[in-house]
Amino acid sequence: MIHPFASALLRWYAQNGRDLPWRHTTDPYPIWLSEVILQQTRIEQGRDYWHRFMEQYPTVEHLADASEDEVLRLWQGLGYYSRARNLHTAAKQIKELGSFPTTLHGIKMLKGVGDYTAAAIASFAFGEAAAVVDGNVYRVLSRHFGIGTPINSTEGKKEFAALAQELLPESQAAAYNQAIMDFGATQCTPKSPACDRCPIADTCQALHTHAVDMLPVKLKKLTIKTRHLQYIYIRVNGEIAIRRRPAGDIWQGLWEPLLIENAPIPPFDGTLTLLRQKVKHVLTHRVLYADFYLLEATTKPTLPPEFIWIPESDLDRYALPRLIELLTQSLTP
């Protein structure tokens, strides 16, 4: 028997569900691609990127055969670049396997695929009765059932995962998962939820106890760190110097001009011009402040061995962090 909560959401979804292109297929590749893109990305922006990826890489084999630079370049502007690297690695895994994994366990073995993404793919593509638990699901369940356990605690994750699975109608897993996510995204929103026209308001514990704005509960966030960056864009006879960022730090694998951090700028031959100062750029756990300089010289300065010189006109072939993209807009030929 389907739980009354699930039945109400399915009825609501039949009338109010979002029409998204990846919902018109059971092919796991476009579904997986959409789930990865939509992590930390609004649907309005993510939809455009999904179309670009599907056009450039219509199958998982096409994606697997691409270079990492090509994938990062197409991803540019979405942020959280580890998603793109994991996507590319997982595509190679799938190609090596010969086909997309068809079980929840098999899908979880793919690089970068966690519990939520695996459950989404398993239910949407293969009809497996695997409940999704994302931010929308946490919010809907915590409010409706009046659960105050912090959603980012170990106890909370277990409690909500168990409840989500208990409520899931096995024969309609895909529709229900989409329903509860859409309900959280458009109806039971973080701020100003539409409680006055909610189809399950009569049984909502948070509404009846005036706790809607207090749920879900989260543990205190991590401390935000501040970094001050000085970038020097070196231009010599139509060429510029860039390097690939190393592993273990932000923007791994992307390209950047000369970075000087926590040190004064050394003397250079040529003309050094400050173009932008204290440009603020916010990441998840960091706030960056960047100064951007242009160094124009007639001879190439000595740089660390990881730097390469490229024609300035070729810069758009390299995947850059969004901050560097913004800073290079200050340049004139």
Regions found by a protein language model. Name each.
Residues 3-8, 12-194, 200-213:
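Catalytic cores of DNA base-excision repair glycosylases
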Residues 1-18, 24, 185-333:
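Intrinsically disordered, low-complexity, charged terminal extensions of DNA damage-control enzymes
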